[in-house]
Every structure is written in structure tokens, then in C-alpha cells.
């Protein structure tokens, strides 16, 4: 395991089922209709902040729409893992200090500056829209993931993480 010491073996196969697949393939997603589950937790995503192709939108937005369709058809719940980054960089170039972003806030004038944030924003928009039509769904916005304090180990795709690149830039400028 890359990030954790515990493998959680005791819950796999009884309470938690990991399904490997391609959420960008609607036909493959639809094969899950026959799998017995009550809640689908989608943590599949491309977390690159930069991409030269349409992979971020295909995975993070269109893939989520395929999962929404599956959950709507089968009347199952969806938990979508998203990011606090959808808050964008600013509210009209200045975030008021008293502004609190609530769970049901999506667009409030913020600036969306990269493909990753846009793709996650559009995915949330699709989940919110589907929930107004009856989909039982929750969105969990994960904060900025950082390296482990114990050994400094960070995610595999360090070079495409916008926040870490920004920190590296600050460090380089300071030198």
C-alpha cells in the first residue's frame, strides 16, 4: 500500500467492496447494475491539475455522470468525493474574510483557474442537479492533501499537483 500501513483486510469482501474499472466507459459502469450494493462511493479521479488532453473532464466529469446514471437507474445512493478547491481562487478577485463556504454552495462568483478545478466543479454540478430530481447523494469535499509528517512521503503524481508546484516555486524564488 502506498499511503497507509493498515490494509483494512477485515472489511473487504464483507462491508467494503473495491471495484476496479473505467468510469469513462458507460457500458462498463452499467455492468454494475447487477452487483448488490446500497451505496456507491466514488473516489475515482484524476488529480492532476494540468493535462494536455481532455482526460480531466472525461474522468472527473463525464465519469461521474455515468455513475449518476447508474445510481438513478438502480435507486442507489452516491457519495461523490470532491475537493475544497471548487471554492476557486477568489470571489470577484477578493474573498471576503467573513465568507463561509457551506455544503450546498457551488457557484458564488468564484474564479475557477484550472482544468482540474473545473472538472470537479462540473461533477458537483451534475450531482447537485441529479439530487434535485431524486438521486440520494452526498458530496464530500476533501481538503488539500499533504505529505506525511513522519517521513515526508507524498502522492505519486507530485509533479502535477498544483499546490505542491506552487510551494516549490516559492521555495525556488526564495533561494
Predicted regions and their residues:
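Short, conserved catalytic or adaptor-binding loops enriched in Gly and charged residues
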Residues: 2-13, 129-132
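NAD(P)-dependent short-chain dehydrogenase/reductase
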Residues: 94-100, 129-175
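Active-site segment of SDR-like NAD(P)-dependent oxidoreductases
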Residues: 46-48, 84-91, 143-146
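Conserved Rossmann-fold NAD(P)-dependent oxidoreductase catalytic core, especially the SDR/UDP-sugar
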Residues: 58, 62-115, 136-138
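Short, solvent-exposed loop/turn and secondary-structure capping segments
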Residues: 51-55, 89-93, 150-151
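Conserved catalytic Lys-bearing alpha helix of Rossmann-like short-chain dehydrogenase/reductases
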Residues: 61-67, 119-127, 166
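NAD(P)H-binding glycine-rich loop region in Rossmannoid oxidoreductase-like domains
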Residues: 10-12, 16-62, 72-74, 78
